[in-house]
Amino acid sequence: MSLQITDIRKAFGGFQALDGVTLSVGEGQLVGLIGPNGAGKSTLFSVVSGFIEADGGEVRFKGGDLGRQSPAARARKGLLRTFQVPREFSHLTVRDNLKAAAPGQTGEGLVGLFLRPGEVARQEAEITAKADEVIAFLRLGHVADLPSGRLSGGQKKLLELGRVLMVEPSLILLDEPFAGVNPVLIEELVERIRELNARGIGFLIIEHDLQALTRLVPILHVMDRGRILASGSPGEVLEDAKVREAYLGGAA
């Protein structure tokens, strides 16, 4: 099992954001996570990725307990996340945003001080080549030299995914990749996710766009009030009476 989340609990004051969440993502699996606003989905992502600490429970990745490991330490193991609101540097070009996300550039940024000039040049060339590879994969060549602040919402979501790809992930937590994205770029994102998954990269995806998500993932979990309400195939889950009441407003 690539990711195992067991009995995770987290409270903020008197509000129980996560109340014993247990779920898993197997090696190379595509798994979806839906639920109403305030269900605890993004809080769960923040716990799993190391941005906040749980009050109880356990997160294991590739068999090892992540404990209190930092987001950077988890990223080095191949566990990375995106954010619903992309966190690009708006004054940097797309290419330079990708280069800034490479190991040794952020989080470990003093590494260059201990390299000989020739080694620095070689590292820079390797990072640039990797950035160009990601740009080609994401079909962003036509905007590669534009400041990222000029990108559309969908292009920023592609760039957010690209920044994660600079770190060689084995499992990506995607936080609402289709939110605010036009249908054409949703299709582009879906195809890129499928292609990455075919290469063996696993995904746990939070999303409100049920149409896009349910044709992408074979396994779906529904959260409500900090708990897993239902799990199964998209067809099974969306026929569950509890899900229809909590998430679909009782719609038939």
Q: Which residues does each PLM region occupy?
A:
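Conserved ABC ATPase "signature" region
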Residues: 110-143, 191-194
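Catalytic Walker B motif of ABC-type/P-loop ATPase nucleotide-binding domains
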Residues: 172-176
